[in-house]
UniProtKB/Swiss-Prot annotation:
Entry keyword set: Nodulation, Signal
Swiss-Prot/TrEMBL GO biological process terms: nodulation
Naturally occurring in which organism (per UniProt): Pisum sativum (Garden pea)
Protein name: Early nodulin-5
Primary role: Involved in the infection process during the plant-rhizobium interaction.
Presence of the UniProt keyword Heme in the record: no
Keyword Signal: yes
Tissue spec: Invasion zone and early symbiotic zone.
Length: 135
């Protein structure tokens, strides 16, 4: 019984490795949600190859930034153009969920609901572990 579970376990591990290694995104969203377009890259190294072909280095000016548009304190003066060396990192949310129509209270970590996520995980993983041992 125990010897037959080893090939199945290895097959599951190998299939998970294949799933994770080939499930990366090759389509990137550029700009904000209003003025956006998608860029497709044929491989994971396409962006690195593009950068090495154009030989970009630190402090290269890709486009000129006005002083009024720049909201940072650190600037360097290179030949008449301002080059932004540091900007605050503001990322838009990847997923925007609609608000709930009902006046439901917000979930909290205190009270009776604390720890239920671990119990659900334990309840789902224990039968799977027992199944793999049984094989």
């Amino acid at each position: 019984m125990a010897s037959s579970s080893s090939p199945i376990f290895l097959m599951i591990i190998f299939s998970m490795w294949l799933l994770f290694s080939y499930s990366e995104s090759t389509e990137y969203l550029v700009r904000d949600s209003e003025n956006s377009w998608k860029v497709n890259f044929p491989s994971r190294d396409a962006l690195n190859r593009w950068v090495t072909r154009h030989q970009l280095t630190i402090h290269d000016t890709i486009d000129v930034v006005d002083e009024d548009d720049c909201n940072t304190e650190i600037r360097s003066k290179l030949g008449g153009d301002f080059v932004v060396t540091k900007r605050p990192l503001v990322l838009p949310p990847l997923i925007t969920l609609p608000l709930s129509p009902s006046p439901a209270p917000a979930p909290s970590l205190s009270g009776a609901a604390a720890g239920h996520g671990f119990i659900v995980w334990l309840g789902a993983s224990l039968p799977m572990l027992m199944f793999l041992i049984w094989l």
